Amino acid sequence: MAKTLYEKVWDSHIVAAPEGEAPLIYVDRHLVHEVTSPQAFSGLKVAGRKLRAPEKTFATMDHNTSTKSASLDALSPMARTQVETLAQNCKEFGVRLYDIHHKNQGIVHVMGPELGITLPGTVIVCGDSHTATHGAFGALAFGIGTSEVEHVMATQTLRQLKAKTMKIEVRGLVADGITAKDIVLAIIGKIGMDGGTGYVVEFCGEAIAALSMEGRMTVCNMAIEMGAKAGMIAPDQTTIDYLEGREFAPKGEAWQQAVAAWKALKSDEDAMFDAHVVLEASDIAPQLTWGTNPGQVVAIDQCVPNPEDETNPTVKASIEKALDYVALTPGTQMTDVSINKVFIGSCTNSRIEDLRSAAQQAKGRKVAAGVTAIVVPGSGLVKEQAEAEGLDKIFIDAGFEWRLPGCSMCLAMNDDRLEAGDRCASTSNRNFEGRQGRGSRTHLVSPAMAAAAAIAGHFVDIRKPY
């Protein structure tokens, strides 16, 4: 029977499937951070249990860390308690930890792939909603809740219902200047923020195959923003080239065996999907969100939508509510929307390719008066490489702040947050009300679009001179 990529990975990880119950699947990698792990570790202690597979558990500090200082003194009391608790738990249970002083510390969904922890055909979980990022390697990766974190710690397994399958095909190649962020925002704009609910999505097509691993991670990262359980891209030579030599990737004969298996890991030609969505790559322009969810998105050469043009009363009410919050007028050209904050970072867009793209816009220019812009590399390794290439100097000379790795302004959980009324061009993944700070307004864009907005003081079409 023909199978999809998802079905192949799923079937190979079933431990038990009792009739009438959710199957029990095996977990190959468990990624842990300071926010969703304390209660899980506590649960193990109360029950007197050990960690089932410490060698398959990897921890980092990212959500509540400071991007201004690596000192514990720079943290709030709550944040300090969280990172110190994680350190103690990792020591007690024998978990490998990349703490704030480790050169490989970073956002969990950045450092995992770059260390080779993420491998094709594996099942990866983390107490974080953007775990789907790792699906870019042909892994089945999804976020779990704290009680599930404890279950995986104790058993290295998880009960899960099998999802439906959706194929999202982006035909042809995108035009120059169009990035992975534009592709995935265009997809979400087409199917909506709940269009993928109940599905595991496989992204494919010429435009997807042409992406680097960094670009593929951006696409899969935002699968959750279309409601999907996970996003996956079949591994190919680009995947293999990226993984070769990484710290936790197989070595020697094991590498050759792995590569042979990975090359065969793809959906069968006659595999049936429950849903199929097609986009033409040539139709995709630079994208940016205007509202309060990632599905409220338009192209840069379009206007703020008018709710009066919407016939569906529910959608109309949603548009009206969003416009009221973001304080935009229907019919306004998106290029006329001014910003006063810029955030380049997050698990969506903080990798070396993203920083190069932003630096290309910033080079030889200056951040506009009244705009504060920060650049937060996704990991210590990304920061090191960017500095070796001189990207930090380009940003600093242009007036951007160059920070330490961390989740930063993606969410209002640490000290990097917006004030009420701030309008931010952000390379993150969510533009919900208050996501970056109470009363703040977020517009999701690519790194190049964010950097260009910082220079111009408003959104611009990077395909044209500005």
Swiss-Prot record:
Keyword check for RNA-binding: no
Binding annotation for [4Fe-4S] cluster: C347, C407, C410
InterPro entries for this protein: 3-IsopropMal_deHydase_lsu, Acnase/IPM_dHydase_lsu_aba_1/3, Acoase/IPM_deHydtase_lsu_aba, Aconitase_4Fe-4S_BS, Aconitase_4Fe-4S_dom, IPM_dehydratase_rel_enz, IPMI_cat
Reported cofactor(s): [4Fe-4S] cluster
Molecular-function GO term, any one: metal ion binding
CDD domains for the chain: IPMI (cd01583)
Cofactor note: Binds 1 [4Fe-4S] cluster per subunit.
Catalytic activity from the UniProt record: (2R,3S)-3-isopropylmalate = (2S)-2-isopropylmalate
Pfam family, one: Aconitase
Enzyme Commission code(s) on record: 4.2.1.33
Keywords assigned by UniProt, alphabetized: 4Fe-4S, Amino-acid biosynthesis, Branched-chain amino acid biosynthesis, Iron, Iron-sulfur, Leucine biosynthesis, Lyase, Metal-binding
Biological processes annotated in GO: L-leucine biosynthetic process
Pathway recorded for this protein: Amino-acid biosynthesis; L-leucine biosynthesis; L-leucine from 3-methyl-2-oxobutanoate: step 2/4
PROSITE patterns: ACONITASE_1, ACONITASE_2
Keyword Transferase in record: no
Superkingdom of origin organism: Bacteria
Disulfide bridge partners, by residue number: none
Cited function: Catalyzes the isomerization between 2-isopropylmalate and 3-isopropylmalate, via the formation of 2-isopropylmaleate.
Summary of subunit composition and partner proteins: Heterodimer of LeuC and LeuD.
Similarity comment text for this entry: Belongs to the aconitase/IPM isomerase family. LeuC type 1 subfamily.
Protein name: 3-isopropylmalate dehydratase large subunit
Native source species: Shewanella loihica (strain ATCC BAA-1088 / PV-4)
Gene name of this polypeptide: leuC
